Amino acid sequence: MDYEPDPFMDDFEDDKRVCLSCLKDVGLRKAFGHSSGKEQGNCSFCGSEAQETVPALEIQALIKSRCMSGKNEAVNELSYCTAEGGYLVGIYQPDEVLESLTLHAVGDEFYGALNEKLNIGNLYCDRAHNMLRPTERWRYGWKGFIETVKHKCRFFFGEHTHEPRDEFDPTEISPNAFLRHHVPQGIERLQAVKTLAAGTTLYRCRITEPHVTVIEMEHIGPPPASDCVGSNRFSPPGIVMFYAGETPDVSALEIGWPDCDGKVLHNGKFRTLTDLTVLDFTNLAYPDGQFDPDWIDGYHIAEFFKDFIRDLSAPILDQRRKPLDYVPTQVLCEYFRFYGAKADGKSRKLDGIKYPSSHDGTPCYVFFWGKELAGKKILLEDLTTAFSRRPATPKGT
């Protein structure tokens, strides 16, 4: 394999070999396992003998690629001001760049060898330093989407003329592009489309006054559209959906139990009748370690989605704000309800979304079902009741 000379770090000699014990990072160990150059031999760094090894050049190339992702030589990016004593924005020494990602990713001997190969005379800076970094760009895209659908244009926001945050940043993400391109791209990359197997147990609760009878699906399943007047995390008033939890406890927490003085909790146990396709935000395929060979150009997507998922399930403490603060998640839900999502390059129609509870992180579900469709997808197997003995929390606390 040919390696281009790199101003950041000189290449190891062709005969240098590295063993698995020298690689601590999960991503580097993954690259080791995928290497076609594995052979028994001695490690050139820790001295281990008769070990499975790979060419050190392969691992070094991966490390260099990750370290230089988003970086550029300062001389190619910045103006040098002699009067001010040098560059006017943040710069990095080569050893700082290497240390930030690699110090705990490899063994001491291998790290020392990498450090010796650095070209100390070069300085580095963030690539396109006057523009947002990739992760920040996605975050600002999300903030812009929230601002637009909450306060500017809700029902035809795709036609809304976006006012750029910075007219000099051509990479800025518009709200429309965020919804239609960036989020679907991240969902496919993170393998969020999953199959929920037939026979899966789910729980759904309802809180009533003591005199109300709840004995069958009609009483605890999706309500009629005429009764759907509240705003929920993924559904606006009038749009019926089926919410459920993975456990009885989280199902109860999601609707405000036990903070219900004198009320009755009805907890329904359901079983899915068919395989269902869901957008699973609770178990995403994030990169392995800092040097996953499949993610070198996409770490910013994974970093953004961790924050994005937290925002999707964040608790809203002020009840008066729910109708407004739920709007972004409602718009996202409606988009995926009608347009589906891609898995392995193929579009898939979705039955619902799996997301972490805002109370304890336990998986919850919202399915795009009304009363009739729910009857074909799930079966009510059991119903239990419980009485609240806890006083209601005074309003405003």
Kindly label every feature range from the protein language model.
Residues 1-235, 258-397:
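Active-site and NAD+-binding cores of ADP-ribose-processing enzymes
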Residues 238-244:
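A short, exposed loop/beta-hairpin motif centered on an aromatic-Gly-Thr core
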Residues 248-260:
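Short active-site loop/helix that positions an aromatic residue
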